[in-house]
């Protein structure tokens, strides 16, 4: 009997070990999952096991809604906290997760042998770097190379990922994983190449060609007595290998902004962003942005923020393995939020975006909150609304291929000021490609309730089911968007797009800040509550024209016949509140008190 007893003991011990081993293996829960490969992408081979990926992990914020309410309050004239912008450390402390939450997440990373030197913790965000093979074990997934059909860009991504149950409730997202979209320039193709007319001819015919002088006349922009102020830095965003060329800038200022020839800009590199001066690549977007932002702003201190992060992220045979992220928004935003308060730009103009549906909702929420954090610190965030009208294809990418108007992100974020487009000058009209509509991710903020509701009442039942009437409406304002003269690689071009509208409006905001600072007032910061409180005073209401979209392929056939948002009296989702009247806006801006 002894051998049998011994055998039973061994079996019992083995079973116990198996049970304990199973208990030691944590159960996992899915954080994010895509039903299928997003439209426009092709799945290729498994990602190289040794490829390094830098991840950004966002923890859920218990006080996010409270914080965003506070940002709106401090930006609303008449509120007791108006103009009381927060300091960097105050924002961090307000949003810092409970210590036990951070400890739990960091403990999980350490238990997965994530190199301690790669872990950086910033409030509710954690960055870490691991090879693909380790990421697959940590996140219970497989990474593959995916190629974009149109651009041939290759990215390492997955369709789903999971984390242990005991940390699942704390994690909002980990990227790059399921986010496939990349920002695109909001720029129409150049209308022609070659040498345009002389400056005198251009100034005499602003209905066909736009220069800084045309815009100054159209929007009543005049010079003020304000001197350059380090508190009023005007920033321009650069992504996707767009290089702001100094020679082109100087030539442009000499030809089209003769009173600004002493103006220049500095360059800040984020995530190894470049600003090559000898590249043969087109830089029309960068040229457009810096040439109009700094020719229209009066003696502004200008900074071009060039951010790296463009693919491909799978190296060719024989190339060095680089750390890949392809998350330029997050890289830029975290860089800016880490800056001391005195080094932040007062205004930041960005002319990039993508279909909102291409952005995971967790990503858009987390990113929008970062924009709100900049607003809390007194930064005015300006985005072009996009160049796809009511939507490019108007087909959802969730596997159902439902017909729907498609909003644009980040323009749809309630904490940015989105700028739509116009054309012509007597009168100005909505331009057909100006993106606008209603967000499917963000509810309508209270500051625009009255304005947007008025439009919806005019619209009635038209387009029911094709949009979200409760969503954040955009754009907020508009400006000219076509026939802009730029100089790129020494060649004079005309270009268009809401890429042009954003730096124009940003320059006007910079001027408003200059006037306020000169009068001893604070920067405007997050603009939208103030803009909507004006009831369109200070804006030309655009009531002619409208947007279009939903085109099938390259033809003029529309998936939704006559798909359009019309420009109407009051706010509309093509031109927002209208185009600026600087002379009125500067008086309004300097009459709103928020003293230091």
From Swiss-Prot:
Positions annotated with a glycan in the UniProt record: 205, 264, 322, 365, 535, 562
Cofactor annotation comment: Binds 1 Ca(2+) ion per subunit.
Catalyzed chemical reaction(s): Release of an N-terminal tripeptide from a polypeptide
Binding-site residues for Ca(2+), renumbered to this chain: 541-542, 570, 572
GO molecular function, a single term: endopeptidase activity
Domain (Peptidase S53) ranges: 209-592
Keyword Glycoprotein included in the entry's annotation: yes
Main location per the UniProt record: secreted
Endpoints of the signal sequence: 1-16
pH dependence remark: Optimum pH is about 6.
Active site: 285, 289, 499
Enzyme class of the recorded protein, top EC level: hydrolase
SMART domains: Pro-kuma_activ
Protein name: Tripeptidyl-peptidase sed3
Swiss-Prot/TrEMBL cofactor(s): Ca(2+)
Gene Ontology annotations of biological process type: proteolysis
